[in-house]
Amino acid sequence: MKSGVPLLLSNVSWGVAMSVQAAILGRLGASGIAASSIAQTLFQCTSVIAYATGDAARVMTGMAVGEGDMKKVKSGAKTMQLMFLIIGVLTSLVLFLVRKPIISVYNASVETAEFANIFVLILCVTAIGTAYEMPCLTGIVSGGGDTNFVFFNDIVFMWCIVLPLSALSAFYFKFPPAVTFALLKADQILKCFVAIVKVNRFKWVRVLTR
């Protein structure tokens, strides 16, 4: 129960954060909002495997930890990290290759199409980070039992870094839409540095079963 509460709170926090992000995106103008929708939809379609690996990593790590086999836990974590990076690179490549044909299908204005192309290029970079940090933290670390860290990490990056900087970009400095969009996705890269250190120290292993 104790390990499940942080995950629940993390999901609630994420839901609220999405509403705040929507308000920030609303400052990008009609073309920016439409372009963001196109880019996000395309990203979600190409990153299904990356998100699925997070669930698989959580189950596999939880089973290994439950068995008390630290050798298996460590070798599994290292193998999965390599797999996450490969999936990220492939996802980024697919996203890059299909962006123009897919964007052209939409009945969008020239400005919207240009914004969408820029946003997708930004996502091509962050996709690699997402494919690595997300399954590492919500999969391996969470599956290992350290759900408190995952919750704390999400709170810090989303509410203390990404949303404040994005809000300043959109409302105060009025930076170009691409800058605001990039800031909204910046945590996907920044979290990678945390994930690398956290996962490979193996201090996240918690035996939750008796």
Regions found by a protein language model. Give the residues of each.
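Short alpha-helical transmembrane segments in multi-pass integral membrane proteins
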Residues: M1-V5, T61-A127, S169-R210
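Transmembrane alpha-helix boundary and packing residues in multipass membrane permease domains
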Residues: L7, N11, S19, A23, ...
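Small-residue-rich hydrophobic transmembrane alpha-helices
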Residues: A22, A35-R99, A131-V150
